[in-house]
């Protein structure tokens, strides 16, 4: 694998990103693995996987610090995605969470900032936080993950809600990221996918056969769940 043979995707807004990126779920949980995790991310960058997905939840923020170490001196080459936890997703909380992530990542902006899943705060509050961060240049785009059709339609109905860049779904289970879209939702949403059991044979097969960032089709799809999958949020 090399950078030249990794397919790319144009996000709403025109940004080009690799379809195959690096996730950091479970990173930052053990100091003994830190050097290996940093090295793995660096190797991925060398192979052209310049999209790195992280979150304030991962390792209680330590995964973001590992990303910062791995991309030191290469920030402009990397597309960084991070996420705000739903309990932090008020307008003020979203802004504060982003600022903490920026500090841990040692960067002045996020390329994409996501709401990790629905919580108690109204979407309009989270959206107001995203819009403030966009205005101040702290994020370049925003999105959501683990959203069902009804969630996406509610978001699209808000002023500015149709600017959503992404909603994520699983290649193994729709338990936490259900039906991708509908005819009334945003028309140009990218759907990055994730295996809920990264080390399993099933996950390997699924990710090999399904596109990493399937496009919205504009029609409603039925929920489905692979047997034995719990719908784990990542």
Task: Show the residue positions of the predicted features.
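N-terminal binding-site loop/beta-alpha segment at the start of enzyme catalytic domains
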Residues: 1-78
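A short, structured active-site edge motif that brings together acidic residues
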Residues: 77-89, 112-116, 146, 169-171
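Beta/alpha (TIM)-barrel catalytic core signal, keyed to glycine-rich beta->alpha loops juxtaposed to Asp/Glu
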Residues: 118-234
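Conserved, mostly hydrophobic/aromatic
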Residues: 22, 52, 67, 80, ...
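Short, acidic/polar
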Residues: 31-44, 90-105, 125-126, 150-154, ...
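Active-site mouth loops of central-metabolism enzymes
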Residues: 23-35, 82-92, 116, 121
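Acidic (Asp/Glu)-rich catalytic clusters
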Residues: 11-12, 45-46, 67-76, 99-108, ...
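Active-site groove signature of glycoside hydrolases
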Residues: 102-121
